Amino acid sequence: MQNGKDDSKMKLKTIICLTLAVILALSCLAGCQGTENPVPASDPPATKEPQGKPEEPVPAVPLSAVINAKALGFSAFDNQLVEYLKQAGRADENFTVSPLSFKAALTMAALGAEGETQAQLLEALGFRSVDEMRAWYATVLAGVDRFDAFFTEMEKEAAELAEYFPDAANSQERTAAYWVVNSVWSNQDLPGEFRQSFLDEIAKTCYAEAYSAKAAELANAVNAWVNEKTNGLIPSILDDASDTSAVLVNALYLKTGWEDGFAKLGDRDFTTRSGEKVQKPFMEQTAHMAYYKDEQTQLVSVPLQGGVSMVFVLGEDTGLADKLSKAEYKLVDVTVPMIDVETTLNQKELVNYLKLLGCEKMFTDTAEFDPMYTDPLCVADIIQKAKVHTDEEGLEAAAVTAIVMNATGVLREPETPEIFCADQPFSFYILKDGASPELLFWGQIVN
């Protein structure tokens, strides 16, 4: 409830910060079974010249269409990625993507690159230097710490309350979780290993773990790690990695509840982009939250616990940050469908996107990853799997991004509430708080 104009503005600013960070999406390649325990990577010297050059896929979207994309209000990299995927054939389908997971994996690649390869990566990511990139990743980890601190404080308060009211004590274990974790993997049966200086760098900057496995077990080992780090939401990311020299993997997982719970409404009509009506399970809540409406856009920012918000947008979603800054804290009756969307992206989209931004050298046999590995490597594929699920209780989402690196360089294929009713195509954003909020997930529901 509002306790005056100043309190309302302060609370609104907090919600806006939380809202500007949860839009990232996840994608993954299928395949996986059990695995033997992976062993930590070591660093013996070896040399092997890469053979051949990865096939150059033809970009499906012109660079001008991406660079001139209308800003959503986040970083240029995030904005252009969303616009590229829309124009590359996904405009009329439900999909989600995780810019944060993608950028985190590319951060490890940039830390292991040098020369033109590193310069192209930094420019694409929007960083002027490696130090600026390190500073950005530190803000990502700080957001994770704030999420944990929120629930730690709640548990502390609950424990203190239980001393006076033991019958009211809640002994349930914490189910909310948010983490951004990284690992790197080398193939024991192929020449070369990660350099210790690189492992030290990514451990310090990204808290990354290093492993190695035999060729036949590499995919299973990576998939087992992915399954664990996403709480089973994404069971696998690789099919076969027997010819893969190294893999850089990021995993992001988020689970939290709504600050005010939704009520189930049952199945209702949802009008798709083509005008067809389909049945979807809907939910509803009425509460005070950030709300904005103009002739082109209607949006509402629904808060979740732990400094996270989910922004639902009807109509035009350009200039989101500016519109959120103009949002008012109002009583809103929100009716939205439950979301269950999963997307897989690979080199046809992610590699093409990076090439449009000028990242060419990392995909060729002249890629400069000597600071990372004792053998020459190039990027053979980039794959991501993202999944977002919402219901009346809250949100669960995960993303995994894997950068596959080969020596051969062969690519693999009582107020009156405002009414917000998303019974037609809409986009959504999942945001984490911070001075420069991160877009964890973006998605659209059109069918």
Predicted regions and their residues:
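Conserved structured core elements
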Residues: 71, 75, 99, 115, ...
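Structural recognition of the beta-strand scaffold that forms the well-ordered cores
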Residues: 96, 104, 183, 310-313, ...
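C-terminal soluble interaction/assembly domains
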Residues: 386, 392-447
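Bacterial Sec-dependent N-terminal signal peptides
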Residues: 11-15, 19
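Detector for small/aliphatic-rich hydrophobic stretches
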Residues: 5, 16-17, 24, 28-211
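Non-catalytic, conformational "gating/processing" segments within enzyme and secreted inhibitor domains
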Residues: 92, 131-314, 325-412
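Short, Lys/Arg-enriched N-terminal segments with co-localized hydrophobic residues
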Residues: 1-9
